[in-house]
Amino acid sequence: MSKSKRIILSVVIILAVGIGLFFFLREVFSGRLIVRDYIFQIGKFQLRWYSICIASGILVAYVLARRRLSMYPIKPEDLDEGLFWGIVAGILGARIYYVIFNWNYYSKYPSEIYKIWHGGLAIHGGIFGALLMIFIYSKIKGYFKFVHATDLFTSVLPLAQAIGRWGNFFNYEAYGRPTTLPWKMYVPPERRMPGFDIDRFFHPTFLYESLWDITIFVFLYFFVEKRKREYGETTALYLILYSLGRFWIESLRLDSLMAGHFRAAQVVSIILIFIGAAWYAYIIGKTGKRDN
């Protein structure tokens, strides 16, 4: 099949999926259709949509990363091994982060700390865990740099996040405050946050973040990666762009983890914006001096 035909086919598939998704969401958001959080159940075992969304996001990101390996001095077998350890570190980081900001509860029920199947993972913790593992792994391997791996990682991470966020959709969680906007999302009574029992429709913040993540992915993967002049640009821009979107979206959510009187995700987002901006400014300054 020629390149032009592949592009046309891809556009047709994307349009078909988009149209189908629009009508599906219209039914769910109106409350005429209630989704369940699992695909099937055998005894006490449930195959949950949340797990499928997370796994699908990782798989798609991995496939796209493999396609870009020619741009990086990283061996395919080391990408595979690094992915495994990155997933382990990401899960641990996501859980540790969540437990820290819910310590009042977990200090009373320490046996719940390891029971991640009861819920409780935070994306910022997952990112920090994965980045720490990338740093350690790059030092162990020695032949590629930390920024080589982080650029490859952050070029596909937004798409994995965009897909993973749909797990929140099936769980009716991570939604925002009540709203009357046309795209408001119906939440069943049993899934509503305490104090919002009489409210029926809420901001679909999972969708906001998913769309924002897709936008970041398209920008980084198809534009920045092909035009960057220095390793580290993709990583710095990811930190800035994701954090800007997350800061705003977090202001709408009802289930934010708190750091004292502040939303933890917003505090972390501000820090990451400054780190990303300083990093990007350093890279631009470095390339500018080199050109001169």
Curated annotation (Swiss-Prot):
A molecular function (GO) held by this record is: phosphatidylglycerol-prolipoprotein diacylglyceryl transferase activity
Domain of life here? Answer: Bacteria
UniProt cross-references to InterPro entries, sorted A to Z:
Lgt
GO process annotations (BP) = lipoprotein biosynthetic process
Binding positions for a 1,2-diacyl-sn-glycero-3-phospho-(1'-sn-glycerol) per the UniProt entry: 165
> What does the record give as EC number?
2.5.1.145
Provide a GO CC annotation, any one: plasma membrane
Record field: transmembrane: 7-27, 45-65, 83-103, 116-136, 204-224, 264-284
Q: Which UniProt keywords apply?
A: Cell inner membrane, Cell membrane, Membrane, Transferase, Transmembrane, Transmembrane helix
Asked whether the UniProt record includes Lipid biosynthesis among its keywords, one would answer no
List the subcellular locations. Cell inner membrane
Which EC class heads this enzyme's classification? Answer: transferase
Q: Pathway of this protein?
A: Protein modification; lipoprotein biosynthesis (diacylglyceryl transfer)
Q: How does it sit in the membrane?
A: Multi-pass membrane protein
Q: Does the keyword Transmembrane helix apply?
A: yes
NCBIfam families xrefs? lgt
Its biological purpose is as follows:
Catalyzes the transfer of the diacylglyceryl group from phosphatidylglycerol to the sulfhydryl group of the N-terminal cysteine of a prolipoprotein, the first step in the formation of mature lipoproteins.
Matching entries from PANTHER family are given as:
PHOSPHATIDYLGLYCEROL--PROLIPOPROTEIN DIACYLGLYCERYL TRANSFERASE, PROLIPOPROTEIN DIACYLGLYCERYL TRANSFERASE
Q: Which family does it belong to?
A: Belongs to the Lgt family.
What name is this protein filed under? Phosphatidylglycerol--prolipoprotein diacylglyceryl transferase
- Native organism is Fervidobacterium nodosum (strain ATCC 35602 / DSM 5306 / Rt17-B1)
